Amino acid sequence: MKEKIQELFEYRKIPYLLSFVKKKERKWLVKNLIQLQKDIYELDSYLETKWNLKTKKLDKYWSKINRTLSKLGYSPEESYKLTSHVRKYQLHETQLRERKMPSRLSKEYYYYYKSCDVRLTRAIISDYTDNGKYSCDITDWRFFDLISEINDDIEDIFEDQVTINGNLFNILIHEVGLEEASKQIYTVLNEFYDASNDRYRMTKNGDKLNIMKWTSEYYFDTVELLRKNSKAIRNKPFDDKAGLYHYLSSD
């Protein structure tokens, strides 16, 4: 799992943000951020593998998350506020069991909350950052994170079709078919790409220019991945009663 977390951090440019943290605090901070991400992944795994969720089990996962946040110096009240978007993400996942699909929501809204774990990491790093050296805030990463989350859905489409997962691309394929699903994802990718360019078009800030450059790179990578995986699905259509849809069809 540590390797998976390190790959996530690399992909989301977490090492770049950590470079603005005082060197003496960096190793300790990274260790605890990895543990926090592990705690969240364990919660996520429970949500993806168990249809009937138990409050006591959920409480156990949240106790681990809060314990790690305590090690990072946050009070229970601060931890509750920091993790509000993780709880919203959990709500979206649990609502699948009530047939409340994420396709009913704005794609920007849904993917924003889906990026809760990475935004939590950014918020914590920000609290340890020398603000005199770094001139961006968390909101500057918005479109980078939105495109990255779409990339994650497309990348994981084959494994997510057999789990209880709120992969929006997978859900759209089941609801409207592959061609329309691909079209909708491509459209929203373009919207996020254009919004990112509009936000930074006139900036001369080096940190923001980096974010714009990375967002652009990830946009083109994701468009290509969408083309590639859509072709693979076209050649071998999904089982319409696998994973999430197995439970929905028998519920």
Sequence positions of predicted segments:
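Post-signal peptide N-terminal segment of secreted/secretory-pathway proteins
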Residues: 21-23
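Active-site/pore-lining binding-face segments in mid-to-C-terminal subdomains
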Residues: 135-209
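C-terminal structured domains
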Residues: 165, 171, 194-198, 202, ...
